């Protein structure tokens, strides 16, 4: 897999078509293949799904690793957009991934702030002892 990663990491990658003619892979295709091979080489699983895919509330909750009632609260509070074509809510994968990225960013920012506060308190305590 290492050699395949090297090939896919090149600026331009060509494959042979049915009649033997070379075809250059478009950059988004090459990047996607690179990420797939990288994940597989690290023993990770992969899933390829269209980003416009609509999920049930249970599928969405499973993806976010939260309970369905918690997800429904997030939907009803307007934190994640959803559609309700009939009686059931549907959530787009795009909306879930955006929410997931936003919460990760918020968590990192909060952790950074806590770290800075703790460092400041530690420095103040050390300064008092001197």
Swiss-Prot record:
InterPro entries, A to Z: DNA-bd_dom_put_sf, HTH_17, SinI_DNA-bd
Keywords (A to Z) from UniProt: Toxin-antitoxin system
Keyword Ligase carried by entry: no
Pfam families referenced in this protein's UniProt entry, alphabetically: HTH_17
Gene Ontology molecular-function annotations: DNA binding
Function per UniProt: Possibly the antitoxin component of a type II toxin-antitoxin (TA) system. Its cognate toxin is VapC50.
Protein name: Putative antitoxin VapB50
Source organism of the structure: Mycobacterium tuberculosis (strain ATCC 25618 / H37Rv)
Primary gene name: vapB50
